[in-house]
């Protein structure tokens, strides 16, 4: 899953640390989210979207092909 977290942080002039504190996670979690190495829980995705006054789907871009991809 791709994210636009970094883009939204820049728009709001917010550091990874500030966002992490606002949503109750460690900065490393934000790093992993931005790199696409971690998929957030629905609750975390919602919290992040609320910080930026946006919809979840504005921040998290889900590739539907990933859903059907065999692992």
From Swiss-Prot:
GO molecular function annotations of the record: DNA binding
Statement: the UniProt record of this protein carries the keyword DNA-binding: yes
Residue span, HTH cro/C1-type domain: 5-59
Domain of life assignment: Archaea
Keywords, ordered alphabetically: DNA-binding, Transcription, Transcription regulation
Residue ranges: DNA binding: 16-35
InterPro entries per UniProt: Cro/C1-type_HTH, Lambda_DNA-bd_dom_sf
PANTHER family: TRACRIPTIONAL REGULATORY PROTEIN-RELATED-RELATED (PTHR46558), TRANSCRIPTIONAL REGULATOR (PTHR46558:SF7)
Protein name: Uncharacterized HTH-type transcriptional regulator AF_1627
Lineage: Archaea, Methanobacteriati, Methanobacteriota, Archaeoglobi, Archaeoglobales
């Amino acid at each position: 899953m791709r994210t636009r977290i970094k883009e939204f942080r820049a728009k709001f002039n917010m550091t990874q640390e500030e966002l992490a504190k606002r949503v109750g996670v460690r900065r490393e979690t934000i790093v992993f989210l931005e790199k696409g190495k971690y998929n957030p829980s629905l609750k975390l995705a919602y919290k992040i979207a609320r910080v930026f006054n946006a919809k979840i789907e504005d921040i998290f871009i889900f590739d539907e092909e990933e859903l059907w991809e065999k692992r």
